[in-house]
Regions:
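ABC ATP-binding cassette signature C-motif
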Residues: 1-217
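Flexible nucleotide-interacting loop at or near the entrance of a catalytic core
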Residues: 3, 10, 208-270
Length: 270
């Protein structure tokens, strides 16, 4: 069952293109890890999926009755509310015992402390508790393990494994990612690549994809050398077929330049 679709979405900040005409379907049972080098737009994509930011083009379509719960990198709160009030805002009153339990698991035992005096890490943990106290069908988590100690990470790992809904998250914790996901989506060079596996399996499949891309580029370079030799022999565009061959050569040369530029950028990112 499909619960949410990202349809032909594009987003640009200034001159930087984050993604171009990308699509993604989130299906029943998916626990997705969204990965990519810093600056590729992972957090922006989560915001668009959560509905807190608009794409330049395209749309996000939710299934009927599908509710989302979003953990942002920077929590928003009212200055005059305490931790428990913040976590329970908009929730059912009978969820309060569970809210207190989750806060305790996340190391926040003073539930009456004002949000505006908490440290950045405590605020993020309070926001995580707010996201989990009444889990929606789809959890959207941006760096959920930041500011968690090892016991808290293990608790969250078990929580997500037991969670019956769907998940898409960004995290730099590769061990956590490997343990809780069953699908990896990579944001790379403004495009999305989906792998039906956890992080360890993704590394193997990505290596295979990159080897295929290198083989394709090597084949293109070989053809390019042959065409260049043909042109240097003094070909004149005396016929439509010859002109078409020259045009194809120019197209291949431009494609080769673009492929090389992408490869050089990958080396810089590494």
């Amino acid at each position: 069952m499909n619960i949410l679709n990202v349809e032909k979405v594009s987003k640009t900040y200034g001159e930087k293109e984050l993604f171009n005409n990308i699509s993604l379907g989130i299906n029943s049972g998916d626990k997705i890890g969204l990965i990519g080098v810093n600056g590729t737009g992972k957090s922006t994509l989560l915001k668009i999926i959560a509905g807190v930011e608009e794409p330049d083009e395209g749309q996000v379509v939710k299934g009927k009755g599908i509710e989302l719960a979003y953990l942002a990198q920077t929590p928003l709160y009212y200055e005059n509310e305490n931790v428990l009030e913040y976590v329970m805002r908009g929730k059912h009153a009978d969820s309060q015992p569970k809210a207190k339990e989750i806060l305790n698991k996340l190391g926040i035992t003073n539930h009456g402390a004002m949000m505006n005096i908490l440290s950045g890490g405590q605020k993020k943990r309070a926001a995580l508790a707010r996201t989990l106290v009444e889990p929606a069908r789809l959890l959207i988590l941006d760096e959920p393990t930041n500011h968690l100690d090892n016991d808290m990470v293990l608790w969250l790992e078990q929580f997500i494994k037991n969670f019956k809904g769907e998940l898409i998250m960004v995290t730099h914790d590769r061990y956590f990612l490997d343990n809780v996901t069953n699908r990896i989506v990579e944001l790379d060079k403004a495009s999305l690549y989906s792998y039906d596996t956890n992080y360890s399996g993704f590394l193997e499949l990505k290596t295979q994809r990159e080897e295929m891309e290198r083989a394709t580029e090597a084949k293109r370079q070989n053809i390019l050398r042959k065409e260049l030799a043909w042109i240097r022999r003094g070909c004149q565009a005396r016929s439509t077929k010859q002109q078409a061959r020259i045009d194809r050569f120019e197209d291949m040369k431009e494609a080769s330049k673009q492929a090389r530029a992408r490869f050089d950028k990958q080396l810089m990112d590494m």
